[in-house]
A protein has these predicted regions:
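An alpha-helical repeat/solenoid feature that recognizes helix-turn-helix modules
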Residues: 28-49, 64-99, 110-142, 146-197, ...
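Internal amphipathic alpha-helical repeat/solenoid segments
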Residues: 54-80, 96-113, 417-433, 657-664
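Short alpha-beta junction capping motif
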Residues: 168-170, 439, 444-492, 675-720
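Structural recognition of the beta-strand scaffold that forms the well-ordered cores
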Residues: 86, 121-123, 144, 178-179, ...
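An acidic, glycine-rich "communication" segment
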Residues: 487-587, 593, 601-604, 618-623, ...
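Solvent-exposed loop/turn segments at secondary-structure junctions
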Residues: 60, 112-115, 127-130, 150-152, ...
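Bacterial N-terminal signal peptides
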Residues: 7-22
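Aromatic-Pro/Gly-enriched surface loop or interdomain linker
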Residues: 357-444, 448-454, 458, 551-552, ...
Length: 834
């Protein structure tokens, strides 16, 4: 009797459970964290405490987390252990840690018996990346395909997955079978495209007309509508499409043009499913809130959407889960099925850790759009077969991020997202600043498509909100990658018009052969076939790269992605141009990021609005004069950003206004400014009055802070040599010398209680022939000229100014922004106190 009752009562339950005057600076109390900064810290702490709770509750002798109900009553041995191990791996625990290794070995010893457990096993082994588990991953994938109901290994119609001995499929078992198959695919297992197409067909056949899916397929109207299963259905369509080696776009590998660009069989199904989810969104759904929360994370990550409906899903989910954490570190989100603290904590940590993955690339959504109400949104500008012009390629961004994560960032998990400002009410400049402050968590913004972008204004008209966001994003350190999908001429014309409006003083130009992008990471002569690539220079670096040639079609398909251990394609091979397209993207990303990892999701940057400050009298404010050395305004935002930082972190009254134009060294206005800044890009040729004017200011209490800016290695060497010659000419008896680490300039006393003892910086290679590949932690390296016991010149031969603007470049020898702020603040405070 008991055996009969459990299938009837517990099967739906267990499905959820298992998967479950001179201004003065004075000390200031620590600033109250911004709301988002506070949430970032809370999430970090929550993950740490949750990990400790799970580790403390491991069965140390067996290496597992098995409990009575799931392991014995439900006969799902390994399910809990797999879920917990997956959560710990995603939280950063290493596979070779003895505790983790024991858990992995326990799982490896389990034969395939239940769909849930087998799917989770594969997810764990794919995440752990132990070579010895690869045969198990392939075995499990074959087992899952063999157990698909009605499929007969591909000879029949796939009708989903269920429990052993049960011929009634359910969409929860099916979801975890699919997750296990895709994990196997990612780990290198062989899964034929026909299986993914069968899965696509399964989900499209079983979706209700209203857009939802049920736990069991069948039925009419809205009877049986399930939020968790609809999330699973939409994720299933995404994953099945991602599993295909070759998409249905009908790409010509010789040209990169797709005959069926933007046409996906699942377009309408995805649209209806996402709209239903948006209209019915709630974390508190289904029989297990924890199971639901993890499903929402997966949907957000796979779709790339920051918003599901009108909900900022990760931010809201973090607030919800952090509030549910107990003192012992467990996260208990409810009663009933969520009463298992081990399972609830594991599901919650998967949400917090995977959702927190840094965003490398944001894809910019554009086009006519309508809020249909009730959490549903509709694209208005779509083609006859559902093509959305900004998203003709569904997987290009995902594949680029996967490629960059593996090859450029040594396997560190990274994510992507769609940036869709159309879902928000951004109606003034203050909101623009808030949006850009959030968007800057992603160092690269990807903008591509077909046709004219309707938000691009007419020549001479005021910037649209979209244009303001893009302009401010670049001004604050962001990088734009543009691509004309299929080489679409109308989009290329629209993109060039957009750049003219955003940066009227700068032009898109063909990148020269000498540009570092061609060798930023991959050094392959085959990249020369993309010689038509264009770039826009602004201040310190190239800030926009645009390809009028088709590239996204290659990025859409995994078959073109270079793979470890696989011989590269040779000229004439159909895969050759596609592989080069991936390598080109890798170089652009390496250049744009300087190979520095993005900040965790939720990180925001506080931006300054120049229209709101300095309207009162300027007397008594700390002021900076940035010298003109032949370039009117290099690193124009550097000192503004430094002054804003000082204003916010010390009680220093600063002026955010600039001298306009920047003064030349012989300008008599310099005597009103005792702090001078020189961002060096061109060699210095000061003579006569220029030298005398600056020296007179220095000898009467002034200070010159200078740095060698980002401008290529040869230009850096020339400026550095010229600056040293200038110092010797100005102060022949006071040589430029290294400022010692124990100098008051860098001391804790001078810098609010924390010494400037370590900075992140990219320096020259040991052979002196170029910059290091990556930034490293170093002690600060500053030089100076000292007169009468006071540093009158402080010089960094490694960039400060470009870093203060947030710009990164792989060829730039210099600091990251946080280090530049620390050094700059130390120099300013020194100038006031000496």
């Amino acid at each position: 009797m008991i055996r009969l009752l459990f299938p009837i009562i517990l099967i739906p339950v267990l499905a959820v459970l298992v998967l479950l005057p001179t201004p003065q600076a004075v000390a200031q109390p620590p600033a109250t964290p911004k709301p988002d900064d506070d949430l970032v810290n809370k999430v970090r702490d929550s993950i740490k405490r949750g990990v400790k709770y799970l580790k403390d509750n491991q069965n140390k002798s067996q290496g597992n987390w098995e409990g009575l109900v799931l392991s014995f009553v439900a006969d799902m041995e390994g399910g809990t252990t797999a879920l917990v191990t997956l959560a710990l791996l995603n939280c950063g625990e290493k596979p070779d840690d003895p505790m983790m290794a024991k858990a992995l070995d326990y799982l490896a010893g389990l034969p395939p018996r239940k769909t849930y457990v087998v799917g989770l096993q594969n997810m764990v082994f794919a995440e752990a990346r132990r070579p010895k588990d690869l045969p198990i991953i392939q075995r499990n994938a074959d087992w899952l395909i063999d157990r698909a109901l009605g499929y007969q290994g591909g000879a029949g119609t796939l009708n989903g997955w269920s429990y052993p001995g049960n011929n009634l499929p359910d969409n929860s078992n099916t979801q975890y079978a699919l997750l296990g198959l895709y994990a196997a695919k990612q780990a290198g297992a062989k899964i034929e495209d026909r299986h993914w197409k069968a899965i696509q067909d399964y989900y499209t056949r079983n979706q209700a007309k209203l857009g939802f899916w049920r736990y069991h397929n069948g039925g009419g109207g809205d009877v049986g509508a399930s939020f968790t299963m609809t999330v699973a259905g939409v994720c299933g369509l995404y994953i099945a499409g991602m599993g295909l080696d070759q998409s249905a776009q009908q790409l010509d590998p010789a040209t990169g043009v797709a005959a069926a660009c933007g046409i996906y069989d699942e377009n309408d199904n995805l649209h209806r499913g996402l709209n239903w989810i948006g209209a019915n969104f709630n974390f508190d759904q289904g029989k297990s809130i924890a199971y639901n929360v993890y499903g929402i994370e997966r949907l957000g990550r796979l779709s790339g959407q920051r918003f599901i409906g009108k909900y900022d899903w990760y931010r809201e989910g973090c607030k919800f889960l952090v509030s549910k954490q107990d003192a012992n570190g467990s996260i208990k989100v409810g009663a009933g099925l969520d009463a298992s603290e081990i399972l609830s904590t594991a599901f919650s940590l998967l949400f917090l850790s995977k959702g927190r993955t840094p965003v490398l690339i944001s894809k910019f959504a554009w086009g006519e759009f309508r809020d249909a109400g009730g959490g549903t949104f509709r694209e208005v500008s779509i083609g006859p077969k559902g093509e959305v012009n900004w998203n003709r390629k569904h997987n290009d961004t995902r594949h680029l991020v996967d490629f960059a994560s593996r090859d450029l960032f040594k396997g560190v998990p990274l994510s992507w997202q769609v940036y869709d400002m159309r879902r928000q009410n951004i109606e003034n400049d203050e909101k623009v600043l808030e949006e850009v402050g959030t968007l800057l968590q992603s160092p690269v913004l990807y903008l591509n498509g077909h046709g004219k972008m309707p938000f691009v204004g007419l020549p001479g008209s005021l910037l649209t909100i979209e244009e303001k966001i893009l302009q401010k994003y670049v001004d604050e350190g962001g990088f734009i990658l543009g691509e004309a999908c299929c080489g679409d001429a109308e989009f290329a014309e629209s993109f060039r018009a957009l750049m003219k409006r955003l940066f009227p003083d700068n032009q898109l130009r063909r990148l020269p052969e000498s540009h570092v992008i061609w060798t930023a990471f991959f050094k392959d002569p085959g990249l020369a076939q993309f010689a038509g690539l264009e770039g826009l220079e602004k201040g310190c670096r190239t800030v926009v790269v645009f390809s009028p040639m088709p590239l996204a079609g290659y990025w859409e398909e995994q078959r073109f992605m270079p793979k470890p251990g696989k011989a590269p394609a040779k000229p004439g091979d159909p895969l050759y141009r596609g592989e080069m397209a991936y390598k080109l993207a890798g170089n652009v990303i390496a250049y744009a990021t300087g190979l520095e990892l993005p900040k965790p999701k939720l990180t925001t940057t506080k931006l300054y609005d120049p229209k709101r400050d300095d309207k009162g009298p300027q007397r008594g404010l700390f002021k900076v004069a940035q010298l003109n050395n032949g370039e009117a305004d290099p690193a124009p935002a550097a000192m503004r950003n430094l002054m804003t930082y000082l204003r916010d972190t010390t009680r220093l009254d600063v002026s955010l206004k600039k001298l306009d134009p920047n003064p030349f060294p012989g300008d008599e206005r310099l005597f009103g400014y005792k702090f001078m800044y020189l961002h060096g890009r061109k060699p210095i040729n000061w003579e006569g009055n220029d030298l005398d004017n600056v020296k007179s200011n220095l000898m009467t209490g002034g200070l010159l802070f200078a740095d060698a800016g980002c401008n290529g290695f040869d230009a850096w060497q020339k400026f550095d040599a010229s600056f040293r010659a200038m110092c010797k000419k100005m102060f022949p008896d006071s040589p430029l010398q290294v400022i010692p680490a124990n100098d008051p300039l860098l001391s804790a006393k001078m810098n609010g209680g924390t010494a400037v003892a370590s900075v992140r910086c990219r320096r020259e290679r040991i052979d002196g022939k170029g910059p290091e590949a990556e930034m490293r932690n170093y002690a600060p390296y500053l030089e100076g000229v000292k007169v009468d016991g006071r540093w009158v010149i402080i010089y960094s031969k490694y960039d400060i100014g470009c870093a203060l603007e947030g710009h990164k470049a792989s060829d730039c020898m210099g600091h990251d922004k946080e280090s530049a702020l620390k050094i700059g603040a130390a120099v300013v405070l020194y100038s006031l106190k000496r």
